[in-house]
Amino acid sequence: MKRFIPIKCYISIVKDKLKEELKCYNTRPHLGAIYFGDNPASDSYIKGIKKDCDELGYEFTAIKVEPSLANSYVDSFNKTPSVHGIIIQKPLPDSVNLSIFDSINPGKDVDGAGKDSIFYPCTPLGVINYLKFNGYRFEGKNACVIGRSDTVGKPLAKMLLDLNCTVTICHSKSDLRRTLTSPLMSSFSCQDIIFTCIDKIEFFDESYFAPTQDIIDIGLGIGKDGKLHGNLTEEAYIHQKEYTGLHNSVVISGVGGTGLLTRLELLKNTFKAFKLDQ
């Protein structure tokens, strides 16, 4: 396998293509974001999206709302012709039902969060597109997706099946140690590529992985130190990284990795929604 280009270089290439295509239009894509409370992870993500939009010349409207007003703001964005994309940033307050995602206009649901959205969820799409760009061969691989959320784990598993992988899905009720070493699986090492997509930071240490495996860390959260962390411990990430040159394996971090790929797909989906409106 050839060496992967750095994620930031890949993102720069894709952004340059978007900038070039945008020159054909007199107006600009407009993304609207709704978020809640004081959540450092949400605040960080919203700031990152604003930075991306500023770089590409998109309009960006981010509104921090009271939970009781969330539906009215979604309705307002839905009815505003100049708003092409809408996202509702998780986590949601307890008083806001998940059905709010289904209230987004499917043609504006650029995060792929609602059941009728015309767009694919950004996180799995971003990861798969990056791997494809680098010539990663999926066909025939044994893939394990750890996590079964509607916007990451499940759609990711479907994409991998469509790419002719043999897919195993684990989740919060799985006994990972037993599942990944069961007779059916032969051993944990029979998994060629593993995607961690759970809501627990630094959950996986190096003992979970084999040196030859490709590890894609998708989960993100704020640690006690106030910083973003992925599903892998720092030691596990470093441990796997040491083997990438020797075994031509791949390891991608959630921090500075899959999170950036998610934002890139959000930009692409917003541009698609914009073009559909022209």
Model-derived features: where do they sit?
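Short, well-structured alpha-helical segments in soluble
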Residues: 69-81
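Positively charged, low-complexity intrinsically disordered leader regions
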Residues: 1-27
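Short beta-strand segments enriched in small/hydrophobic residues
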Residues: 28-37
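Short beta-strand segments
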Residues: 35, 87-91, 146
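Anion-binding alpha/beta catalytic cores of soluble intermediary-metabolism enzymes, centered on
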Residues: 4-5, 12, 85-138, 202
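Rossmann-fold NAD(P)-binding glycine/threonine-rich loop
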Residues: 100-109, 216-277
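Glycine-rich phosphate/diphosphate-binding loop of Rossmann-like nucleotide-binding domains
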Residues: 38-48, 121-214, 218, 223, ...
